[in-house]
From Swiss-Prot:
Membrane-topology annotation of the record: Multi-pass membrane protein
Any one cellular-component term (Gene Ontology): chloroplast thylakoid membrane
Stated family: Belongs to the complex I subunit 1 family.
Transmembrane segments: 27-47, 98-118, 129-149, 165-185, 203-223, 248-268, 269-289, 297-317, 340-360
Assembly information from the UniProt record: NDH is composed of at least 16 different subunits, 5 of which are encoded in the nucleus.
Protein name: NAD(P)H-quinone oxidoreductase subunit 1, chloroplastic
GO biological process annotation, one example: aerobic respiration
Root EC class: translocase
Native species: Olimarabidopsis pumila (Dwarf rocket)
Keyword Plastid: yes
Record's keyword annotation contains Cell membrane: no
Single GO MF descriptor: quinone binding
Catalysed reaction, written as an equation: a plastoquinone + NADH + (n+1) H(+)(in) = a plastoquinol + NAD(+) + n H(+)(out); a plastoquinone + NADPH + (n+1) H(+)(in) = a plastoquinol + NADP(+) + n H(+)(out)
Length: 360
């Protein structure tokens, strides 16, 4: 009996050990996801504060200054206010479409962050088709906007949803062609491989210098995909009140607000990854690999800092553009996409393909 009791205790201890391992495994699965979401939320809060401060500087006025030091908690105050507001629904609208639309817009953009590499070893999903995954997922967001506009049973909302879909289709194609040119130069569709391909020649190895035309087209198309001025036709206040957001209030309206800045941040990160060398420091005689060999935590921190510094440089350009240029008309927007950017991006892809074939 004593031997039997000992065996039972041993088996129970092993079972507890295995269950603890499973629990720890589950915890370590969610830790990177939670860290990424926390970083994204912090990045969005910083972008909102930067936009308020930069717009105040451009317009020569004082920005937010009461919510926290230098107004840094203004975005948190706005989010809290929207959280406690009543969620109104149109009486004759399509309630399922009206409710699901904002969630689809936010979730599709959040999933795109999984393929962003912040360093050589810090990427949530290092996939062989990472770039195509981003393009495929980002094309789902306009469907959510169209659902929101249609479900609102409002002519202004429906027109805003149609404009969002038309604008996305018009600028998604030039953007995809620019990405294909980059993948041809890097011989890969993985975001990590694209960054490493730019690290061979330092600063002059960036795709910015090898694809200047593609960089400009990607820049314009990214702003159009984010629906930022001068491309904010889906929510033009003078024409459509607030576009597809007209009937929304409370937290659902806040989701559109968050989705806009999430889209801007992901576009800035992809500009950094595809054209600005990603996490590479690009300073002579300083190698990221040497930093990793000395101290992996220090090297990863430096890589994250470099990536974010390049990202916020593009964000500054986007914010300054919003408060500088006037809004385009709808016909000008579509003509720019179909008659100007699409032929140039297609020619750039054919030229890149020719150079790659002759260099074999």
């Amino acid at each position: 009996m004593i031997i039997y009791a000992t065996v039972v205790q041993t088996i129970n201890s092993f079972v507890r050990l295995e269950s603890l391992k499973e629990v720890y495994g589950l915890i370590w699965i969610f830790v990177p996801i939670f860290s990424l979401v926390l970083g994204i939320i912090t990045g969005v809060l910083v972008i909102v504060w930067l936009e308020r401060e930069i717009s105040a500087g451009i317009q020569q006025r004082i920005g937010p200054e009461y919510a926290g030091p230098l107004g840094i908690l203004q975005a948190l105050a706005d989010g809290t206010k929207l959280l406690f507001k009543e969620n109104l629904r149109p009486s004759r609208g399509n309630t399922p479409l009206f409710s699901i639309g904002p969630s689809i817009a936010v979730i599709s953009i959040l999933l795109s962050y999984s393929v962003i590499p912040f360093s050589n070893h810090l990427v949530l999903a290092d996939l062989n088709i990472g770039i195509f995954l981003w393009i495929a997922i980002s094309s789902i967001a306009p469907i959510g906007l169209l659902m929101s506009g249609y479900g609102s049973n409002n002519k202004y909302s429906f027109l805003g949803g149609l404009r969002a879909a038309a604008q996305s289709i018009s600028y998604e194609i030039p953007l995809t062609l620019c990405v294909l040119s980059i993948s041809l130069l890097s011989n890969s569709l993985s975001t990590v491989d694209i960054v490493e391909a730019q690290s061979k020649y330092g600063f002059w190895g960036w795709n910015l210098w090898r694809q200047p035309i593609g960089f400009i087209i990607f820049l314009i198309s990214s702003l159009a995909e984010c629906e930022r001025l001068p491309f904010d036709l889906p929510e033009a206040e003078e024409e459509l009140i607030a576009g597809y957001q007209t009937e929304y209030s409370g937290i659902k309206f806040g989701l559109f607000y968050v989705a806009s800045y999430l889209n801007l941040l992901i576009s800035s990160l992809f500009v950094t990854v595809l054209y600005l060398g990603g996490w590479n420091i690009s300073i002579p005689y300083i190698s990221i690999l040497e930093l990793f060999q000395r101290d992996q935590i220090f090297g990863t921190t430096i890589c994250i800092f470099i990536t974010l510094a390049k990202t916020y440089l593009f964000l500054f350009i986007s914010i300054a553009t919003r408060w500088t240029l006037p809004r385009l008309r709808m016909d000008q927007l579509l003509n720019l996409g179909w008659k100007f950017l699409l032929p140039i991006s297609l020619g750039n892809l054919l030229l890149t393909t020719s150079f790659q074939l002759f260099s074999l």
